[in-house]
From Swiss-Prot:
<comment type="subunit">
    <text>Homotrimer.</text>
</comment>
<feature type="binding site">
    <location>
        <position position="108"/>
    </location>
    <ligand>
        <name>Mg(2+)</name>
    </ligand>
</feature>
<keyword id="KW-0961">Cell wall biogenesis/degradation</keyword>
<dbReference type="GO" id="GO:0008360">
    <property type="term" value="P:regulation of cell shape"/>
</dbReference>
<keyword id="KW-0963">Cytoplasm</keyword>
<keyword id="KW-0548">Nucleotidyltransferase</keyword>
<keyword id="KW-0133">Cell shape</keyword>
<dbReference type="GO" id="GO:0005737">
    <property type="term" value="C:cytoplasm"/>
</dbReference>
<keyword id="KW-0808">Transferase</keyword>
<comment type="similarity">
    <text>In the N-terminal section; belongs to the N-acetylglucosamine-1-phosphate uridyltransferase family.</text>
</comment>
<feature type="region of interest" description="N-acetyltransferase">
    <location>
        <begin position="253"/>
        <end position="454"/>
    </location>
</feature>
<comment type="pathway">
    <text>Nucleotide-sugar biosynthesis; UDP-N-acetyl-alpha-D-glucosamine biosynthesis; N-acetyl-alpha-D-glucosamine 1-phosphate from alpha-D-glucosamine 6-phosphate (route II): step 2/2.</text>
</comment>
<feature type="binding site">
    <location>
        <position position="229"/>
    </location>
    <ligand>
        <name>Mg(2+)</name>
    </ligand>
</feature>
<protein>
    <recommendedName>
        <fullName>Bifunctional protein GlmU</fullName>
        <ecNumber>2.7.7.23</ecNumber>
        <ecNumber>2.3.1.157</ecNumber>
    </recommendedName>
</protein>
<feature type="binding site">
    <location>
        <begin position="11"/>
        <end position="14"/>
    </location>
    <ligand>
        <name>UDP-N-acetyl-alpha-D-glucosamine</name>
    </ligand>
</feature>
<dbReference type="InterPro" id="IPR050065">
    <property type="entry name" value="GlmU-like"/>
</dbReference>
<dbReference type="InterPro" id="IPR011004">
    <property type="entry name" value="Trimer_LpxA-like_sf"/>
</dbReference>
Amino acid sequence: MSRPTVSLIVLAAGQGTRMNSDLPKVLHRVGAAPMLHHALRAGQSLEPERVVVVAGHGAEQVARAARAFDETVEVVVQAEQLGTAHAVAQAAPLLADAPGEVVVLYGDTPFIRPETLERMIEMRARHAVVVLGFEAADPGRYGRLVTRGEDLDRIVEWKDATDEERAITLCNSGVICAETHLLFSLVSEVGNANAAGEYYLTDVVALARAKGLSAGVAICDEAETLGVNTRAQLAAAEAEFQRRARAAALEDGVTLTAPDTVFFALDTFLGRDAIVGPNVVFGPGVTVESGAEIRAFCHLEGCHISRGATVGPFARLRPGAELAEDVHVGNFVEIKNAVLDEGVKVGHLTYLGDAHVGEHTNIGAGTVTCNYDGVNKHRTEIGAHAFIGSDTMLVAPVSVGARAMTASGSVITEDVPAEALAVGRARQVTKPGLATRLMEMFRAARDASKKGTN
């Protein structure tokens, strides 16, 4: 059976007053990515034809973040935050003629699973409106879902519920799915005759039932519905994201020697049989291929690590770092916007930025590519099978040819031809006996100084 055409609406207009922040709530990060990206990524699993983000507070920032995730995302602005139904209505001019289904998600609810959304779409074959519910450990003031089997009879707000209805633990998440034309028709009928004077999306269930249409409930784990309204909830969301990411990595065949100390980003990819040591942090945009090893206390972002490579301990890989197979990057090494070909070894205490290093080249301890002149960045090219001596300063732009060598302590300011040895340091001068005479002179000066102060 073919998948129906789907559109996606993500509500992202809330100010998030309780976050006590100038940043729009949906742009606070979980797993090194805005919460909005989590919602968009979950919705992506439905292969939506169109995606509309409803922005409000900080609309320009929200729009930039949405389009950074997917440049085809459309953004509309809810100038006044008058409730969730009012927010959905802002998408009507864009989607009113869209075929198929529409799913409404929330930009501050980052943990809805793709399989949950798939289940909602499947249930749409049996119900005009499908609501996502969850069994709450502490139902508190959540809206209650009054059901008969999977059929939803009504949604009752806590303040309006009887004691019997308050005993219900099946609660409303707010996520909803319906045929596109029907949803916008129902939304247009929602009123605001309530204490808050807002237009609530949940009212579409009662409106649908009044028309003789069926409503259903898809049930998910409570953790999927975790919303973020405070900094404490943001911290809880981060903890839940990391718990899930660690469990998924282990399930996928990755070795985590101390799982609770490894931190993932939303888009971290680790291949099977990769090994990750303790206290490793993955920022955005990291791919680690099968069989690679990341040792303790490394920080990685925007980099690609190929099969058999080893990184760390105490290494930092920054955006643009590309490590080919069997590369070794050791302790206290920083790589930025640099490509290291197969078998390159960078043992320790080195900075390689804006560089390309050919295969099987050895980079000695203390090597620095001096890539910045105070205004512009410049590139360093190092050929294959070269040997860069310890404490070499490579003042870019500069190149070192294949199988060339640089002497330890050299400052290389000119290109080094293939197979040449470059020495760029002052000649050593040795003065026999001078060390002893100097120490005697220094001690005499010190003693004279002490007598002068008495």
